[in-house]
Amino acid sequence: MSIDRQTLLSVAKSIRSGAKSIRAQISPIHPKGYPFVGGFALASIILFWIWTPLGWIGTLLTIWCALFFRNPARVTPVREGLVVSPADGRISMIAPVVPPAELELGEQPMVRISIFMSVFNCHVNRSPVAGKIERIVYRPGKFINAELDKASEDNERNSLVISTPNNGLVGVVQIAGLVARRIVTFVHDGQTLETGERFGLIRFGSRLDVFLPEGTQLLVSEGQTAIAGETVLADFQQADGGRTYRSN
């Protein structure tokens, strides 16, 4: 049975289209994760030589590690005044608190939105607003449970202060947790960020705090799931009548 050229071209086009569709659905791995995924993969091969069931366990861990370091594309709302989530995870706390001293944002309370990232969330962090990085401050510390309120004071953390064009200063704090022992930041002082732009990651479970001026209109509540770069946390253009801080 012969197949004409037109049929072959049609089949090839369908295969290419299918391959593109599959690639679009699979998130790439962030380069910072290559050593970890490679290490797990190598360990899996060795475990297969030792005992096959161990090899399969290693394979599952390799897949989990690859998923942990996934670096998906996100569709970010860009209207002036919107504040988007800097991390994937659960909004664990919303409260008015005095920001950490290293942020140099004064001693008046600001609205703090805390987002807890489990080991199953994507851990690439994104800028919640557009603006210029005024300063980046690293502070060593403990590694207690990141869900606890005191983790914002006691744990290892890396802080960014971003100056927005029209809405003042916003603080973003990466906080290490029980498992996470390494905070990574890709940016530097003076750099300009777009809303939703990647600026860092925290390895294996952690927390992100966002500090906003009091009176900012909040659009989320405690317990809600947030998606980095997409979920809108607040709106500076609706500064009156912010939400009450309570769990639903």
From Swiss-Prot:
The keyword Aminoacyl-tRNA synthetase does not apply. The active site is at 206 (schiff-base intermediate with substrate). It is found in: Cell membrane. It comes from the Bacteria. Is synthesized initially as an inactive proenzyme. Formation of the active enzyme involves a self-maturation process in which the active site pyruvoyl group is generated from an internal serine residue via an autocatalytic post-translational modification. Two non-identical subunits are generated from the proenzyme in this reaction, and the pyruvate is formed at the N-terminus of the alpha chain, which is derived from the carboxyl end of the proenzyme. It is a peripheral membrane protein. Pfam families: PS_Dcarbxylase (PF02666). It is an enzyme of class 4 (lyase). The keyword Cell cycle does not apply. Pathway: Phospholipid metabolism; phosphatidylethanolamine biosynthesis; phosphatidylethanolamine from CDP-diacylglycerol: step 2/2. Belongs to the phosphatidylserine decarboxylase family. PSD-A subfamily. This is Phosphatidylserine decarboxylase proenzyme. It comes from Nitrobacter hamburgensis (strain DSM 10229 / NCIMB 13809 / X14).
